[in-house]
Amino acid sequence: MTTILKHLPVGQRIGIAFSGGLDTSAALLWMRQKGAVPYAYTANLGQPDEEDYDAIPRRAMEYGAENARLIDCRKQLVAEGIAAIQCGAFHNTTGGLTYFNTTPLGRAVTGTMLVAAMKEDGVNIWGDGSTYKGNDIERFYRYGLLTNAELQIYKPWLDTDFIDELGGRHEMSEFMIACGFDYKMSVEKAYSTDSNMLGATHEAKDLEYLNSSVKIVNPIMGVKFWDESVKIPAEEVTVRFEQGHPVALNGKTFSDDVEMMLEANRIGGRHGLGMSDQIENRIIEAKSRGIYEAPGMALLHIAYERLLTGIHNEDTIEQYHAHGRQLGRLLYQGRWFDSQALMLRDSLQRWVASQITGEVTLELRHGNDYSILNTVSENLTYKPERLTMEKGDSVFSPDDRIGQLTMRNLDITDTREKLFGYAKTGLLSSSAASGVPQMENLENKGQ
């Protein structure tokens, strides 16, 4: 069976991930007019820039959908976001600022929950608005087929007939008007935005050029912290975790995790926390650039890792970072539910996150400028009395340290011998002023 359909399957049911925007509206109307039977599915991901979710299915019905459903994905999205924090599943960082993989998390939830809803309705053909150059076309492909092995894919933006007729936003707008729908194009921004409750992605258009900065972006989850006219008073916030799960903000507990994430977004957003500018490698190995917002994810991540460093030993922390980066890349590639990702998630949640219990107090200022004011946990292995510089009882003596240093002579001697071995082969040069070989000064040698 052909998995990807290049042309519209006339007379068959097609499920379309319907956002209510111009692209999916025109695609739905066009498919109906050409003889397909479109079903519209809208994911409620708690997008901060969406004002009326209930109106979206109604519009889909007006444009010719056989049926239209609104699928509440918020609870599952927040659950996956918390899992990503517990595992440190983030691999794109620049200068210490992290991209929290909020779009990949959203695609994992959308791609599974919408296809599951389609399957309930007997719809086994899926279309969405992803383009052939991006990451989402592969993410949705993987998640869709994982959920429904019988799924076929039809994307209007891969259909030459659709492209020839409605290949641009201007053509789509004229098509909608000609069909009796007074659909006016929204004012074009200098970039495109995609968002969910966990974060927002700003990319493309002017942001494709590296001489365009965050200053052209209007945040939808925070504030322009770089603008001196925006007054942002400092704010103290306390985050409490129990067994790796965030349970309270400023002492307030929540009825569910969705409400907790919304409050974390409000707190972090007041300061512009979690904004970052990243150059990343897409799945197809081409580089792209995005500016990201994730105020709630950033707040929880900072507090989580503060507790992590005070509770776990160095080797465990090293494995957390290494496995977290590996898991983050799998998430980015649309492999969040693959066996290798599940293996990494299970080990990190079981052996790392389960011990993260405690409370962290921070002072938030402008953007990613913050201070940690206090860290409290019954699981802390940080014991200041062990290394105090003050006179008093100690868990080890000067003689103990002398013995420990003496044992180091073994590997120090081995290292010296290796350095001289490198010098003999020309990798290092001998120096009259030093007792050990040194790196060649390539500049002095004219290289």
Swiss-Prot record:
Pathway: Amino-acid biosynthesis; L-arginine biosynthesis; L-arginine from L-ornithine and carbamoyl phosphate: step 2/3. L-citrulline binds at residues 99, 135, 139, 192, 201, 203, 280. Its main location: cytoplasm. It is found in: Cytoplasm. It catalyses: L-citrulline + L-aspartate + ATP = 2-(N(omega)-L-arginino)succinate + AMP + diphosphate + H(+). Signal peptide: none annotated. L-aspartate binds at residues 131, 135-136. The keyword rRNA-binding does not apply. InterPro entries: Arg_succ_synth_type2_subfam, Arginosuc_syn_C, Arginosuc_syn_N, Arginosuc_synth, Arginosuc_synth_CS, Arginosuc_synth_type_1_subfam, AS_cat/multimer_dom_body, AS_multimer_C_tail. One of its GO terms (cellular component) is cytoplasm. SUPFAM superfamilies: Adenine nucleotide alpha hydrolases-like, Argininosuccinate synthetase, C-terminal domain. Its EC number is 6.3.4.5. ATP binds at residues 17-25, 43, 129, 131, 136, 194. GO terms for biological process: argininosuccinate metabolic process; L-arginine biosynthetic process; urea cycle. Keywords: Amino-acid biosynthesis, Arginine biosynthesis, ATP-binding, Cytoplasm, Ligase, Nucleotide-binding. Pfam families: Arginosuc_syn_C, Arginosuc_synth. GO terms for molecular function: argininosuccinate synthase activity; ATP binding; protein homodimerization activity. NCBIfam families: argG, PRK05370.1. This is Argininosuccinate synthase. It comes from Shigella dysenteriae serotype 1 (strain Sd197).
